[in-house]
């Protein structure tokens, strides 16, 4: 059972707390950061296990190279920075030194998407899903809330191979009652709300907004199935095949190459007779502003999502 709780808590905090838990469980787990540990929350691990924490400085490419080297010695490696730098600046090193040899490196990137806020376009990474899912051997995940993040981090620690996880800067609304409810399995989507008229597939911090949109649609006599798609690669093709004839994707990411692109590929490759509406960042750069204002500006808040869906349904 999921619901909009009205309680907000940072996924980054869930990440930091879970790193400490995993550090106690796995003596071969190490954590790297690129001089942003206070923001990424890896500082929690550094305080608890200083001998297993390495600050690479503002040198993300070097950090990934260090992570790859440590992984070859049997370490479980977590490497973190802001998503713009962890995925963008370090992309070639990730491709050639981590993904190509399929090393056990987990790149956990924070401050993803438009809701970075006042930092503006230079820090608003809305292309990371696209560039990371294009890399062979790479798993790409966007957790939903604080509790869900904890289970995502636990799961990828046990998975042997490269993983990219993105999470936002802001505190996001909790939709799960506890960790037990916030189940996660790599490559599996999850139906959160049953519906008959359309399917909304959302990922990351947009899942609560999709739930909010679903409530507004219900008030207007429209029954929406809501699907949480935490793993964008490998994507759950079966849940897409079983979706309604009208599919809407929602993401805090470019509609090019992100969740919308991934769902479009499944629909096209399988010859599915489904209408697709992609809601996300429409091939533009971000701008400075408060997170909530930016969500509304780019049409990514629940009210705007519902309005866009109703407008689209009137065309049918």
UniProtKB/Swiss-Prot annotation:
Keyword Glycoprotein attached: no
Gene Ontology biological-process annotations: organic acid metabolic process; sulfur compound biosynthetic process
Keyword terms, alphabetized: Thiamine pyrophosphate, Transferase
SMART domains: Transket_pyr
E.C. numbers: 2.2.1.1
InterPro entries membership: PDH/Transketolase, THDP-binding, Transketo_C/PFOR_II, Transketolase-like_Pyr-bd, Transketolase_BS, Transketolase_C
Cofactor: how bound: Binds 1 thiamine pyrophosphate per subunit.
Reaction(s) the record says it catalyses: D-sedoheptulose 7-phosphate + D-glyceraldehyde 3-phosphate = aldehydo-D-ribose 5-phosphate + D-xylulose 5-phosphate
Pfam short name (any one): Transketolase_C
Cofactor: thiamine diphosphate
Recorded GO MF terms: transketolase activity
Disulfide bridge positions per record: none
Family stated for the protein in its record: Belongs to the transketolase family.
Protein name: Putative transketolase C-terminal section
Protein species of origin: Methanocaldococcus jannaschii (strain ATCC 43067 / DSM 2661 / JAL-1 / JCM 10045 / NBRC 100440) (Methanococcus jannaschii)
